[in-house]
């Protein structure tokens, strides 16, 4: 799954992308419902690895099934 697809689903689930302070290939996300944040790589056209995505969702307090259904 590409970063844009992940970002779209996270927004639908109520997460917010925090403002970028500098250039780089990683973006910080915040889940207001849980108060937790995580960092996701933005690799453009390359797919995110499933383990990386699952770990980020776990840090945000989002279940995998909930994410898939979004």
Short names for language-model regions:
Residues 1-14:
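Polyanion-binding surface elements
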Residues 5, 17-20, 54-57:
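Alpha-helical interaction segments
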Residues 6-9, 20, 32, 63:
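Short amphipathic alpha-helical "recognition" segments used for binding
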Residues 17-51:
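A short, structured beta-strand/loop element
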Residues 36, 44-70:
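C-terminal structural segments of small proteins and small subunits
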């Amino acid at each position: 799954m590409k970063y844009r697809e992940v970002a779209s689903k996270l927004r639908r689930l109520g997460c917010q992308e925090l403002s970028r302070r500098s250039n780089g290939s990683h973006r910080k996300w915040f889940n207001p419902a849980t108060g937790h944040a995580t960092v996701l790589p933005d690799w453009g056209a390359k797919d995110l690895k499933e383990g990386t995505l699952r770990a980020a969702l776990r840090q945000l307090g989002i279940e995998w099934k909930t994410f898939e259904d979004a």
